[in-house]
C-alpha cells in the first residue's frame, strides 16, 4: 500500500502551486505531477493566518489530514503531489461536508490530469491488487 508522505520544504509547496487547482467552499486542492519515482503520495497541508489563530489553523489542518488519510489512497492518483489549503470554514463545517468536498476535489483533479496528460501510462490509479500486494 502506498504511503502518504508530507511536504516539509517551501519549494515543494511552490512547485505544486504551479499545477492544477480546485476550490470548494471549505478548502482548496492544488496538485501537480510528482518528481519522485516512488508510488507514494506526497501531500502538504496549509492554513494561513487569515483563517484564524493557531488553534483554528491546527484544527483545520487536523481535520484535513484525517480525511485525506482516509480517502486519498482510494481516490488519489499515483505520481501526483497534492496540497490541501484550509479556508475559514474548514474548522467549523460539518465533517461529512468536508469529506464530500475533498473527494470531489480529488476526482476533479484526477479528471484534469487524465485529460491533459501527454502520456496517460505514467499516471495510474492504485488498484486493489496493488494495494494488497504491498
Q: Can you annotate each of these PLM segments?
A:
Residues 1-134:
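Positively charged, solvent-exposed patches that mediate nucleic-acid binding
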